From Swiss-Prot:
Homodimer. This is ATP-dependent lipid A-core flippase. GO terms for molecular function: ABC-type oligopeptide transporter activity; ATP binding; ATP hydrolysis activity; ATPase-coupled lipid transmembrane transporter activity. The gene is msbA. The chain crosses the membrane at residues 66-86, 103-123, 190-210, 290-310, 317-337.
Length: 623
């Protein structure tokens, strides 16, 4: 009921009764929907400017580290042209023997400059990594905070792979590329400026030839920018699809094996994997083409420089040392320019990742307009008054004008055919689903007037789909108790849930890890652990959502005994599939097509020979 299950995208049903093709239908739909949603706002300049502002406002929070890193990068940049300048005295004076002290001075100068540059680069890189990781921690914190606050409906619509990618890949790309942009933009720009200054000082005529070709290189880079961004966005989408397919392959491995789904899963994976390869190759092609085109432009400039330099040398205006120094500075300028032209690709990747991250951060959180807390002592009285609800695009109400009262300590069971509205109705009590009409009252207080924290702190849940965390048994039992739970309370809860004997037989007892998805426990053990968790919370209202429907008879017997202890003195709403488990309920409410068609104790409903009797007799014959 309340669990988030990854699955195929909403609306992925084969039209006209056509068999669903997992290799194409849903993946194509998901990719096209993702692309349409993500492509729409990306091209506008205001959106890009806003993304830049949001990313670098977070980076700017660590301005002290940034300023120090920039100063260190300036120091490293200052050493770059100095190495080229040394070439002139080395060739003109050093080899001629005109200045003997150059024998030791020039080598030491070279070593000293390279050492200084290495120190500056190390500490600037360290500081930028420190900034990036702090920003990444903050962004992921924002994302997780928003994730926890999303409405339940968003999880049912969401794509697990896409969400995971936002945390693991996109968030890292935002901070990684953001600091890369700073590094390249500052360090390489300073290097280029310093080298151009040296080149102009050495020979303004030769330098002008180089400067003429720079706008051409920039124009080529801009031409590739838009294409790179579109390709990068599609690559992000396909990475999310690949994560989803692999995740479903892992989660559903038993079903795949038992239903011989190998070929279907291979088709799904190959379809996404092939598309991802195509997008990766398009991106690689664009990246690969950008560099040689830029280099061709620069090589034309170099050829012109050599021609002019030879002319000046023949007239005696240029020495060998001066030309070597000029060419050394010119050779050093190519890599910084290359990195600056490649910066466009990193900027686009950063913007695509930022768009993905802030799409999650900007999602509307769960509405929590209530201001009241439940008055103490909480009794556990629950009342539904003419409650109705219809899901978007549905042709009828899922719940229609349902009214009933549950007195404190009573047990009321909701039964009916699949799709009758049982789960939707119970989901309204913790406000996972909001009613379209009517009121729900908790101790005579409308639940919309209560804060979510106050409302949910007085509710406990035991469902068919037990969610346990990858932690110890004690941590899972004490989860939600509002503080540290001592071992004695944990053991008491486990004993009441008929699980203590099993836990004591484990090597680490209550401190035994349960593993991911509680894989080390059986279905019945997971259910009883959930019951122990509910006992520790000790909420006055309990929701049981088909808590025994997936268990064998022996496990059901043990769990049912534990549930009876849990239900004592608590208001309990039970959604039951096996009607044999609700015979002792104070009242049974029978739903059909979202409406109450019968209600009363078990014996009266059987005697009435209505829908409940029909469902009960059908199950009795099956059993």
């Amino acid at each position: 009921m309340l669990a988030w299950r990854p699955g195929r995208p909403d609306g992925c049903r084969a039209a006209g009764g056509r068999r669903y093709n997992p290799g194409h239908d849903c993946i194509k739909a998901s990719v096209s929907l993702n692309s349409a949603a993500r492509n729409a706002p990306a091209g506008s300049q205001p959106v890009k400017a806003e993304l830049w502002k949001r990313v670098y406002s977070r980076v700017g929070s660590y301005w002290k580290g940034l300023v120090l890193a920039v100063l260190l990068m300036a120091g490293a940049a200052a050493t770059q042209p100095t190495l080229a300048v040394i070439m002139k005295p080395l060739l003109d004076d050093g080899f001629s023997g005109a200045k003997p002290h150059y024998v030791w001075f020039l080598p030491l100068a070279v070593v000293g400059l390279i050492l200084l540059r290495g120190i500056c680069n190390f500490f600037s890189d360290y500081l930028l990594a420190w900034v990036a990781n702090n920003v990444l921690r903050g962004i992921r914190g924002e994302m997780f905070e928003r994730l926890l606050g999303l409405p339940d409906a968003d999880f049912k619509r969401g794509d697990t792979g896409r969400l995971l990618n936002r945390f693991t890949i996109d968030a890292g790309n935002v901070t990684g590329y953001a600091t890369d942009v700073i590094t390249v933009l500052v360090r390489e720009t300073l290097v280029v400026i310093a080298l151009i200054g040296v080149l102009l000082y050495m020979s303004w005529a030769l330098t002008l030839i180089i400067l003429v070709m720079l706008p051409v290189s920039v124009g080529i880079a801009r031409a590739f920018t838009r294409r790179l961004r579109r390709i990068n966005r599609e690559t992000v989408n396909m990475n999310a699809e690949l994560t989803r397919v692999v995740s479903e392959g892992i989660d559903g491995q038993r079903v795949i094996k038992l239903f011989d789904g190998y070929d279907a899963e291979r088709r799904r994976f190959d379809f996404v994997n092939s598309r991802l390869r195509r997008f990766a190759m398009r991106s690689a092609t664009a990246d690969a083409a950008l560099t040689p085109l830029t280099q061709v432009c620069i090589s034309v400039a170099v050829g012109a420089v050599i021609a002019v330099a030879l002319s000046q040398a023949n007239s005696g205006a240029l020495t060998v040392g001066s030309f070597a120094s000029f060419m050394a500075a010119l050779a050093q300028i190519f890599d910084p320019i290359k990195r600056l032209t490649n910066l466009a690709g990193k900027m686009q990747k950063m913007l695509v990742a930022a768009e993905s991250v802030f799409t999650l951060v900007d999602q509307t959180p769960e509405a929590d307009a209530g201001t009241r807390a439940l008055p103490e002592p909480v009794r556990g009285k629950v009342e539904f008054r003419a409650v109705s609800h219809r899901f978007p695009d549905a042709d009828r109400d899922t719940v229609s004008a349902v009214s009933f009262l549950v007195e404190p300590g009573q047990t009321v069971a909701l039964v009916g055919r699949s799709g009758s509205g049982k789960t939707t109705l119970v989901n309204m009590l913790p406000r996972f689903v909001l009613p379209d009409g009517g009121d729900i009252l908790f101790d005579d207080v409308p639940i919309q007037d209560l804060t979510l924290r106050s409302l949910r702190s007085h509710l406990s849940l035991v469902s068919q789909d037990v969610v346990l965390f990858d932690d110890t048994i004690a941590a899972n039992v004490g989860y939600g108790a509002g503080g540290t739970v001592d071992d004695a309370r944990v053991r008491d809860a486990l004993a009441a849930a008929n699980l203590l004997e099993f836990v004591d037989g484990l090597p680490l007892g209550i401190h035994t890890p349960v593993g991911q998805n509680a894989a080390r426990l059986s279905g019945g053990q997971r259910q009883r652990l959930a019951i122990a968790r509910a006992l520790i919370k000790n909420a006055p209202v309990l929701i049981l959502d088909e808590a025994t429907s997936a268990l064998d008879n022996e496990s059901e017997r043990q769990v049912q005994a534990s549930l009876e202890r849990l239900m004592r003195g608590r208001t309990t709403l039970v959604i039951a599939h096996r009607l044999s488990t609700v015979q002792n309920a104070d009242r049974i409410i029978v739903l059909d097509a979202g409406k109450i068609v019968e209600h009363g104790p078990h014996s009266e409903l059987l005697a009435a020979n209505g829908l409940y009797a029909s469902l009960y007799n059908m199950q009795f014959r099956e059993d």
